[in-house]
């Protein structure tokens, strides 16, 4: 059985971050263990030094007072003071560093377990839905095959049966038809539910990813605070620990917590590689060219299924238009909505776009089969190269790979496109200051990019694009082969300025 989660980029990114976080937690525990040993040594040394100071004091009590004995008395007091310093240092390390660190680590461990359970729960829903779809499909295929055999029996025996036998067979055929329609609807609904469970899992991964990043920031802040407190206590030792403290202070003075946090963000950043999610498509008995069903029969059964998809496509398209209008209103009227409303609407837009893509892929597949049966030219659709099949025993399964940027970038793009939807064509607008200089800059496509909107450019790996404007939200505007449009900045690499000058002169 094919695993729908194995090759998911979301899953890989989340697991990489978990591994990174686990390494950071192990380091934090090792540092805390070292501090505990240091505290034990300080307390043990303080006790030993206190005993020596007491012995020296007793010896001085039985000694005649003199300049020498007075000097040794100061030495005894010095031992006591030093012992007190070591005692305070050991206790301070325990109370201000070790105890808070273990408390934070325990809370973080519970939080990680909760996040892992949440991810596992939603992942199981995806796998369960995937298996339910295949099970429902197999059941539908068997029922369709039996129904078709019964249908053929009725058709072939009409002339040789009595009216009573005909009624009996027709009643049986009617019940079979009702059962088949019920199983067909059940299969269709499970297929439609597949995208929502997948979205829930991806959103859970996204949220858990952000939560673990926050735990990493907290851990880095904790380690920095421990170092600062450690530095303050060491400073109290005075001249005897100056050399050691100087070395530590130099190292601590170089700490830039913002830089550390930025390093974590960069090291665990989501790569801008194209994310393609796999979704099962509906497969029907009527599509099997090797079935015993005749051509006209197959066409008559495929058309209602195609009409159902077209109705859903029309509804999803209207929903899309409504959501686009809402986003434009939010963008143009800042007092009308808050950031949460805009984000929620963008999420609904993303969900609707995914549903529309899946419906169109199913519709294209059935339309292609119907065109083949009616000997018409094959329809064209951008998803034609994204539909794949694999065979399992006597069944063939179809699935589509839909390009989907990662959630944060995806929602930013939706809001950005909605806010710019009412503006004039970028190609005909007045260039801003510096635009003439920028237009001579070039970039090279690192990955292929399939445009999903009319104002986007199709990119192939190695294409050289002229940059006209660098927009916010990770999208640039440029031209390729005379066509202007937007393209994702993460898919290209900007060439040196001399490359742009050379291209301009040419």
Curated annotation (Swiss-Prot):
Domain SH3, chain residue ranges per copy: 438-497
Signal peptide as annotated in the record: none
GO molecular-function terms, A-Z: DNA binding
SMART domains in the record: SH3
Example GO biological process: negative regulation of DNA-templated transcription
Pfam families: FCH (PF00611), SH3_9 (PF14604)
Summary of the tissues where the protein is detected: Expressed at highest levels in heart, kidney, placenta and lung, and at lowest levels in brain, thymus and spleen. Present in vascular endothelial cells and placenta. Over-expressed in placenta from women with pre-eclampsia (at protein level).
The keyword Nucleus is assigned to this record: yes
Coiled coil start-end: 160-222
Record carries keyword Cell membrane: yes
Database matches in SUPFAM superfamilies: BAR/IMD domain-like (SSF103657), HR1 repeat (SSF46585), SH3-domain (SSF50044)
Described function: Multivalent adapter protein which may decrease NOS3 activity by inducing its translocation away from the plasma membrane.
Name assigned to this protein: Nostrin
Organism: Homo sapiens (Human)
């Amino acid at each position: 059985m094919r695993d729908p989660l194995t090759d998911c980029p979301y899953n890989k990114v989340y697991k990489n971050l978990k591994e990174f976080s686990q390494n950071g937690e192990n380091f934090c525990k090792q540092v805390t263990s070292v501090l505990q040993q240091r505290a034990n040594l300080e307390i043990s040394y303080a006790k030993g030094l206190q005993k020596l100071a007491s012995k020296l004091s007793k010896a001085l009590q039985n000694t005649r007072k003199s300049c020498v004995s007075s000097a040794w008395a100061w030495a005894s007091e010095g031992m006591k003071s030093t012992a007190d310093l070591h005692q305070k240092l050991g206790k301070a390390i325990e109370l201000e560093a070790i105890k808070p660190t273990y408390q934070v680590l325990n809370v973080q461990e519970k939080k990680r377990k909760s996040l892992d359970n949440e991810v596992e729960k939603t992942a199981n829903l995806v796998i369960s839905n995937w298996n339910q779809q295949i099970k429902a499909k197999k059941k539908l295929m068997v029922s369709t095959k039996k129904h078709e055999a019964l249908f053929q029996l009725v058709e072939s025996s009409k002339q040789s049966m009595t009216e009573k036998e005909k009624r009996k067979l027709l009643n049986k055929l009617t019940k079979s038809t009702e059962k088949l329609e019920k199983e067909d609807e059940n299969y269709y609904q499970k297929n439609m539910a597949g995208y929502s469970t997948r979205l829930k899992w991806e959103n859970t991964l996204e949220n858990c990813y952000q939560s673990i990043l926050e735990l990493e920031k907290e851990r880095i802040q904790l380690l920095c605070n421990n170092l600062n407190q450690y530095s303050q206590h060491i400073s109290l030792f005075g001249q005897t620990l100056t050399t050691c403290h100087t070395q530590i202070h130099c190292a601590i003075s170089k700490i830039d917590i913002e830089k550390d946090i930025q390093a974590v963000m960069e090291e665990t950043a989501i790569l801008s590689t194209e994310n393609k999610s796999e979704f099962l498509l509906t497969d029907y008995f009527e599509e099997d060219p090797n079935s015993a069903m005749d051509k006209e029969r197959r066409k008559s059964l495929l058309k209602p299924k195609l009409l159902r998809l077209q109705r859903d496509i029309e509804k999803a398209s209207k929903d899309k238009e409504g959501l686009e209008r809402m986003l434009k209103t939010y963008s143009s009227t800042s007092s009308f909505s808050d950031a949460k409303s805009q984000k929620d609407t963008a999420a609904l837009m993303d969900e609707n776009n995914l549903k529309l893509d899946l419906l169109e892929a199913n519709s294209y597949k059935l339309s292609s089969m119907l065109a083949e049966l009616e000997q018409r030219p094959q329809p064209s659709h951008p998803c034609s190269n994204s539909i794949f099949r694999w065979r399992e025993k006597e069944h063939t399964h179809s699935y589509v790979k839909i390009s989907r940027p990662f959630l944060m970038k995806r929602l930013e793009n939706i809001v950005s496109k909605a806010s710019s939807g009412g503006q004039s064509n970028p190609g005909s607008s007045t260039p801003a200051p510096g635009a003439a200089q920028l237009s001579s800059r070039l970039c090279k496509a690192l990955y292929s990019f399939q445009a999903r909107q009319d104002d986007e450019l199709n990119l192939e790996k190695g294409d050289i694009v002229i940059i006209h404007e660098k927009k916010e939200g990770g999208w640039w505007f440029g031209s390729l082969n005379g066509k202007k449009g937007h393209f994702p900045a993460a898919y290209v690499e900007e060439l040196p300025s001399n490359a742009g000058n050379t291209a301009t002169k040419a």
